[in-house]
């Protein structure tokens, strides 16, 4: 039998906005390209061209995915000269991502 931990809020207490944002976050994590980008960013800050090069992706693809992730506040950016550097906005989502990676690799 599976036991569920008690949380501060029951499922019935979740408001529509919270449900929507949680669903959007899982949607973000459902895309292999976004997972690869987040995993790379979990190792340190990178510029768009560096992400594209390391992941063998087009810069336009990386920029599009970073916009998506930034809109969900999963990544943040900072400008240095002509380059924009990206890093994780919040470690919580990275923790979930790492747990899922570990879960899928577990025998």
Swiss-Prot record:
It is found in: Cytoplasm. InterPro entries: ArsR-like_HTH, HTH_ArsR_DNA-bd_dom, Metal_resp_trans_reg, WH-like_DNA-bd_sf, WH_DNA-bd_sf. It comes from the Bacteria. GO terms for molecular function: DNA binding; DNA-binding transcription factor activity; metal ion binding. CDD domains: HTH_ARSR. It holds the Pfam family HTH_5. PROSITE patterns: HTH_ARSR_2 (PS50987). Residues 48-71 bind DNA. Residues 14-107 form the HTH arsR-type domain. Zn(2+) binds at residues 90, 92, 103, 106. One of its GO terms (cellular component) is cytoplasm. Keywords: Cytoplasm, DNA-binding, Metal-binding, Repressor, Transcription, Transcription regulation, Zinc. Can bind copper. It does not affect DNA binding but it inhibits zinc-mediated regulation. Metal-responsive transcriptional regulator that represses transcription of cadA and the czcD-trkA operon by binding specifically to their promoter. Binding of zinc causes the repressor to dissociate from the DNA. This is HTH-type transcriptional repressor CzrA. The gene is czrA.
